């Protein structure tokens, strides 16, 4: 489920667009509206889609977070994979809209939505640019700092190969990516944010 936001009045010709992934909030109203309404006001189409276990999109992906399902990792299952499939379908829907220029679609989102915008850009080469807003961290932060105990499973694409997000970032290059983090973030270490950004920057050189 989701909402397609369009400029009013609608200009002639196809629009650049933003795919916005919602994070997981206690309410679907108000928490991210200031991040989504800005796009149609600036001439973009914006499709805001619900992540799994949010509003009208049922499911469960909090096995590590609160379900004690550590077997998910050994079985090669990652809840981020389910979220990614959901996000890729949202991208297909948006890119097929007659109002949208499919060559000019960026992705963004906050918290779990930030993680999903990152993974969507990794998997979908048609994404023109990505701006993950928090939600993306290094493997050390995830496991060493026990970040998985404080966040939804959708932020961690661990699986059997135990790949770091820095490895995934290499798959976005050379397309533009801007990481947006909080200096006072208590859930993910700002030091690990810097590690992620510095190593990703090295890939682009």
Write out the residue ranges for each language-model feature:
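N-terminal cap/lid segment of alpha/beta-hydrolase-fold proteins
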Residues: 1-13
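Cap/lid segment of the alpha/beta-hydrolase catalytic domain
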Residues: 11-96, 103, 138-148
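Alpha/beta-hydrolase-fold catalytic nucleophile elbow
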Residues: 50, 108, 133-134, 180
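Alpha-helix C-terminal capping segments
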Residues: 98, 122-126, 171-173
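Alpha/beta-hydrolase fold nucleophile elbow
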Residues: 99-111
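Glycine-rich nucleophile elbow surrounding the catalytic serine of serine-hydrolase chemistry
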Residues: 109-121
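Mobile cap/lid helix-loop segments that gate and shape the active-site cleft of serine hydrolases
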Residues: 128-170, 174, 186-197, 203
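Short beta-strand/loop motif that positions the catalytic acidic residue
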Residues: 172, 179-181
């Amino acid at each position: 489920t989701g909402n397609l936001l369009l400029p009013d009045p609608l200009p002639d010709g196809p629009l650049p667009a933003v795919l916005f992934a919602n994070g997981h909030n206690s309410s679907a109203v108000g928490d991210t509206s200031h991040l989504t309404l800005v796009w149609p006001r600036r001439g973009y189409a914006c499709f805001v889609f619900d992540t799994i276990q949010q509003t009208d999109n049922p499911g469960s992906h909090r096995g590590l977070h609160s379900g004690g399902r550590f077997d998910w990792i050994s079985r090669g299952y990652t809840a981020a994979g389910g979220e990614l499939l959901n996000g890729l379908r949202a991208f297909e829907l948006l890119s097929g809209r007659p109002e949208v220029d499919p060559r000019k679609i960026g992705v963004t989102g906050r918290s779990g939505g930030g993680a999903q915008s990152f993974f969507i850009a990794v998997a979908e080469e048609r994404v023109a640019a990505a701006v993950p807003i928090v939600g993306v961290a290094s493997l050390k932060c995830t496991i060493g700092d026990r970040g998985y105990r404080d966040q939804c499973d959708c932020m961690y694409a661990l699986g059997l190969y135990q790949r770091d997000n820095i490895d995934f970032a290499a798959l976005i290059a050379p397309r533009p990516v801007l990481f947006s983090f909080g200096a006072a973030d208590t859930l993910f270490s700002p030091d690990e944010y810097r590690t992620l950004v510095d190593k990703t920057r090295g890939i682009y050189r």
